[in-house]
């Protein structure tokens, strides 16, 4: 089992616990577990139920070290009948299981009616396909020995734990076939909302047991004047009107009056609830026969998912239609029809930009209200700004069509590069101009109430020591110097690139420089094409190795030397597994010559990282003072997330923290991001009182994601601008919370101090702008808008015309010919394949390490350059519908003009302007 599989099993354990009854698979796992462990699991189920038993089973499972146990676990699930769970774990995709949650909630709520009206014997034969065989036997036995209601209760419990995605529909058909009264309540076809509303009619005044969350941050569930724990607040009757706080009404007031507004209020105060108030008021103000249409923009996918849930639960009960669209769903639905058919639409902004550009949405006039979450992003070429460019062109042009009201939400408007209040005011006015805002709403009249809800953490900056001597860095730096010299000697002309001074190893600056050199080498051309191939391939290898060495130095600076060394060992292992030519053998030999010394240095206790020692002291002290402390630890990179998680787990004094990790979904050159279900699972575990006590996160956690209340925030070599500072600090929401900045750099501390000064300037500037009369503020904003439009128009670039000339694609590593652009076809908008058997002879396939099915594609293999000793990664081989085709990535190739011979690199397909021909199945049969 790989470390990643173990980590994923940890991340998804909450899904597994909800479904798995481990006693059903113990017979298959008996050779992997001790007899005593099997007995403990059985006892845990008998005493506390299957969920606690599953938790204990996973605990034992994750302790196993022998090879093969993970596959044995999957086989056990499959043979026991847990096919859905087995499939989810194999692909690490729990979306099908997650979609069942609303049906589980409904069945829990309707369980009294289910027990009162259903005889399990009448429908068990129909439902057997959705249940484990052993569950069917237990239901029959309980029905026969304890009666109908006890049997129905057991059946409901088993259905709620079922991993079969069709169980809600099968239950409906079984109930209808039996003419059961319960079928009137269980209406799957017409949706969860209809079924719930029918249940509400039958329940009368009975309080609902379904919990709803309608806020940006968990503590804002307590919208009354009596702050309490979330569990208390969430038990309110579903239909009781939620009482806003006075400061929330103050924030909502300008927007309720119809003004374009930027709402600037601290993280944790419930800005999402404010947006719900505004949205509800807006939709209700239209006279009979007219309707409003609201669009809510969320910038990040986890935030989008969160807000889609919040808006749905709040507004569906008021009779409004709500829909949500993201990049993951936009290809399979008509965005135009979704917008036409719904009152409220939750969107990621790029979806609207794309549909405005292709004409599917004619203009922004289809909406009556636009709400921008994290609106401080409305700048430069961000999708928010692209939407507002359309808005402002419409406003400043001759069109008479009505424009929607605009509302922006943010914890900080920022000050840009401003050093004075005047410059800050100019920056804020620019943001107001971008959003066409006439008001900045802040809490002024109800500050005392706000301070009772949002606690500003105590900020502590600690300058920590760096290593006084660093033998590890010296050894790696020497290897880098030797590699640079080898690269320099390959080509006299390109060797000049390596003569540039002031490139410090182990820095982001060096990373940027080596990436630039890497690109320059890849398009280097010579008259002798064989020699060009040799030179480019050698330089590709040298620059790749330099980049990995630089990565390792960056890791060792903030983590343990062993983490950096393991990173390099994994890299050289991959090198040996791929094409292993003379150059790579030489580079590997040099590394292995130093490996024993590197191992010795990294294991030496005297080389412990002082930063980690200081982090240890902070955690020890805070958890000693307050054992129930919940911590978010912010770090810069995913590699550091993994390293610190390992460090905490291996430290006996800290392992009780049970660290969780939260990273972004995007892919970097070093790692694949977390899937959305994995992110949600981690957040749920962190919110649970007994699970993770510390969450190690990258920047994905500092903006907008709904993270539970915590009382300790640690910024580990982590600093940004004033907006980032306010957002990360805002994650410490409990009373008496603290925010530590730990860094070895005096510059970082100075930057943080500068951010604190800028925050004061920002607040001061907002207050001054709020004293301006409406006319003065409006004129200032209008002047900026006119000037910005003139600048935009003067810089307007015509759309690039696709180049219809045929071009060559060459391997980005060895420069071997791959294909012509004339043979490339576009599959479903964003995938690119190559036609013809000739191309298939130029690559080799290897099994994909993570085969997966998504939409119409099934990943089957990875494809690599077939030239001897190259094996450059070209993309993947997939099954698309009934076809098996290669899918290539443009960053793996160099594009050569056939006529001029000029070569270029493109990191994204959108930057490569060639004539795109759509995939036609008819061509595959030619």
Curated annotation (Swiss-Prot):
ATP binds at residues 243, 248, 265-272. Residues 219-926 are annotated as: Interaction with ZC3HAV1. It catalyses: ATP + H2O = ADP + phosphate + H(+). GO terms for molecular function: ATP binding; ATP hydrolysis activity; double-stranded DNA binding; double-stranded RNA binding; GTP binding; identical protein binding; pattern recognition receptor activity; RNA helicase activity. There is a cross-link at residues 48, 96, 154, 164, 181, 190, 193, 813 (Glycyl lysine isopeptide (Lys-Gly) (interchain with G-Cter in ubiquitin)). Its main location: cytoplasm. Coiled coil: none annotated. InterPro entries: CARD_dom (IPR031964), CARD_RIG-I_r2 (IPR042145), DEAD/DEAH_box_helicase_dom (IPR011545), DEATH-like_dom_sf (IPR011029), Helicase_ATP-bd (IPR014001), Helicase_C-like (IPR001650), P-loop_NTPase (IPR027417), RIG-I-like_C (IPR041204). Disruption phenotype: Death between 12.5 dpc and 14 dpc due to liver apoptosis. Those who are born alive show growth retardation and die within 3 weeks. It is found in: Cytoplasm; Cell projection, Ruffle membrane; Cytoplasm, Cytoskeleton; Cell junction, Tight junction. Induction: By interferon (IFN). Innate immune receptor that senses cytoplasmic viral nucleic acids and activates a downstream signaling cascade leading to the production of type I interferons and pro-inflammatory cytokines. Forms a ribonucleoprotein complex with viral RNAs on which it homooligomerizes to form filaments. The homooligomerization allows the recruitment of RNF135 an E3 ubiquitin-protein ligase that activates and amplifies the RIG-I-mediated antiviral signaling in an RNA length-dependent manner through ubiquitination-dependent and -independent mechanisms. The RLR CTR domain controls homooligomerization and interaction with MAVS/IPS1. In the absence of viral infection, the protein is maintained as a monomer in an autoinhibited state with the CARD domains masked through intramolecular interactions with the RLR CTR domain. Upon binding to viral RNA and ubiquitination by RNF135, a conformational change releases the autoinhibition promoting further homooligomerization, interaction of the CARD domains with the adapter protein MAVS/IPS1 and activation of the downstream RIG-I signaling pathway. Monomer; maintained as a monomer in an autoinhibited state. Upon binding of viral RNAs and conformational shift, homooligomerizes and forms filaments on these molecules. Interacts (via tandem CARD domain) with MAVS/IPS1 promoting its filamentation. Interacts with DHX58/LGP2, IKBKE, TBK1 and STING1. Interacts (via CARD domain) with TRIM25 (via SPRY domain). Interacts (double-stranded RNA-bound oligomeric form) with RNF135 (homodimer); involved in RNA length-dependent activation of the RIG-I signaling pathway. Interacts with CYLD. Belongs to the helicase family. RLR subfamily. This is Antiviral innate immune response receptor RIG-I. It comes from Mus musculus (Mouse). The lineage of its organism: Eukaryota, Metazoa, Chordata, Craniata, Vertebrata. The gene is Rigi.
